[in-house]
A protein has these predicted regions:
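Helix-biased "structured C-terminal domain" signature
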Residues: 1-541
Length: 541
């Protein structure tokens, strides 16, 4: 069966992608399919090696479409290394064609330097990547500027801090994937503008929505359940091929908005509807946010990040205003096939006076690409490179993993300003068997110095329940409470084994934190190494 906008039968695509994963030795398993509405299907595809960390989601108007979507996203993120972008990759190159530049090297062309260092605040250290062992090199990947096919090197740290997965795509053909990637870029650009500016969007005429039976049927079914559903023109005045569907749950006063994009309106609307229901049942359409008039909260970068992760963030009441920000202006597309769709999208990009850079991947024998449109397709604000750089965690990675090699006072001086609630494995890019927070780490350092009162202040406010036990024993010592008076009570409440471990920690015989790496992390590195074999064979030619 050929789906609208796809260049191969869906069954053929699925079989091909299965073979790709089997060939590289990175097979994955599906979760149970969700099918809440007649034309909405979604699945989760997780790696067998590290299922909580390496996974993709798929959606579609039929079951096979959602399966193909999940496989496509999985291969896209596998082949582009996006699955590994948040992890330390010790003694490994990110890609064979990367270049590790000295500070001040020939990375970024003048136009890109003007964009990413407009205020002159960006330093070379801000461009050091998160993944490698380099501390004094800038690892960059070659991209091709679409307008003139000139190569430029873009630091990985810009890609991971600002763009993450935006603009990644996989397809049966190059242009099919490029249409997907550029459509996604336009969708997220319009979405962020609509949310931050509080734009009120015009509705699509009901007669037009009726002409797309799958979408109309699912809209009507949601309305019958009591939800207030609107199908909205998100083109920002006919500029971008973007649509939205809003859902108000009047029972708990929440609002959720999904977005979709594609040159073909029907495809855009189907994507928007399946996005609305992705990973959801009809029983959990009550976990959304209540709208607000506080637009500073809505436009906050943390809220925008929430919208990027799972579309569930705050929406401002201005979005619901009866006074619309734009006239209804559907875009006009009459072409046929991926080549025409891509040309249509490139014309839109040209109308916005934007340059696009493309990196292509085919070493798994299935096409993937990464597209970036500087000062347009970034998901995170440009000043994150200076004030919220992901590579900050790299600076303390070895301190955390091997703190015995360092002076404890130096460690505390280094981490003192860091938030106690920081998730340590996310911050430094590993997976621990037992994860801990920055506060737990600080407390451990203080315990090594026998600064028990300072450790107590952290432990009592920690989410670490075992830390609470250690805190109680510190209080007993401070208050000179007789052990014999409470030994039986402590054993009854906590158990003898935990009490003995807590005593050992206070005596310096054991550590509060466990730095043992989870097997999932080792499995993930093995996955990376399997890909490396394919990369080397491809790039050598």
């Amino acid at each position: 069966m050929n789906l609208l906008s796809k260049n191969s039968p869906v069954e053929q695509s699925i079989n091909k992608m299965k073979e790709v994963l089997k060939d590289v030795g990175c097979e994955a398993s599906f979760s149970q399919e969700k099918h809440p509405l007649e034309n909405c299907f979604s699945v989760n595809l997780a790696s067998n090696e590290a299922p909580n960390h390496i996974y993709s989601n798929g959606k579609g108007v039929i079951s096979d479409a959602s399966i193909a979507s999940a496989y496509g996203e999985y291969i896209e993120r596998l082949q582009t290394n996006n699955f590994f972008i948040d992890f330390h990759l010790p003694n490994r190159k990110y890609f064979p064609d990367e270049v590790a530049f000295d500070f001040g090297g020939d990375y970024l062309n003048p136009e890109l330097k003007e964009i990413y260092d407009a205020d002159g605040e960006l330093e070379d250290k801000d461009l050091v990547d998160f993944n490698s062992d380099y501390m004094d090199k800038i690892v960059a990947l070659p991209f091709i500027r679409e307008s003139d096919k000139v190569k430029t090197y873009i630091p990985i740290n810009i890609l991971s801090n600002l763009f993450v997965s935006n603009g990644l795509a996989t397809g049966n053909t190059a242009n099919e994937a490029k249409v997907q990637a550029l459509s996604e870029i336009f969708e997220r650009y319009a979405k962020i503008a609509i949310i931050k500016e509080g734009y009120a969007l015009p509705k699509f005429p009901d007669e037009l929505v009726k002409s797309f039976p799958k979408v109309y049927k699912d809209v009507q079914d949601l309305r019958k359940l009591g939800y207030i559903i609107e199908v909205l023109d998100s083109s920002l005045g006919g500029v971008f091929p973007v649509t939205a569907i809003s859902l108000i749950n009047p029972i708990n006063n929440t609002l959720f908005v999904s977005f979709g994009a594609h040159p073909i309106l029907e495809v855009s609307l189907e994507r928007t509807m399946t996005e609305l229901m992705q990973g959801r049942d009809l029983t959990n359409l009550d976990a959304f946010e209540i709208p607000t008039f506080d637009m500073s909260l809505v436009s906050d970068s943390f809220n925008i990040e929430a919208h990027f992760i799972d579309s569930n963030g705050k929406i401002g009441f201005p979005f619901l205003s009866a006074k619309k920000s734009f006239e209804y202006a559907p875009w006009k597309y009459t072409g046929n096939g991926s080549d025409a769709e891509y040309a249509f999208l490139l014309d839109i990009l040209a109308s916005q006076n934007r340059e696009m850079y493309v990196r292509e991947y085919t070493y798994l024998d299935f096409y993937s690409c990464q597209m970036i449109v500087p000062n347009f397709s970034e998901v995170y604000p440009l000043d994150d490179m200076v004030y919220n750089n992901k590579n900050n965690g790299k600076l303390i990675r070895d301190m955390v993993l091997n703190f015995e090699k360092y002076d404890v006072n130096d460690i505390l001086d280094t981490v003192d300003s860091l938030d106690d609630s920081l998730n340590m494995q996310l911050y430094i890019g590993v997976i621990f068997k037992e994860n801990f927070t920055m506060g737990d780490f600080k407390a451990q350092m203080l315990l090594l110095l026998q600064e028990y009162d300072d450790a107590l202040e952290i432990l009592e406010f920690s989410s670490n329940k075992f830390g609470h036990l250690v805190a109680q024993l510190i209080r007993m010592n401070n208050d000179e409470i007789e052990w014999a008076d409470y030994e039986e009570a402590l054993y009854n409440v906590y158990g003898k084994e935990k009490i003995q471990r807590a005593v050992n920690i206070l005596e310096g015989k054991e550590f509060l934190i466990n730095r043992t790496l989870h097997q999932d992390y080792n499995n993930m590195l093995s996955m990376f190494d399997k890909l490396e074999v394919k990369k080397l064979a491809f790039y050598k030619n």
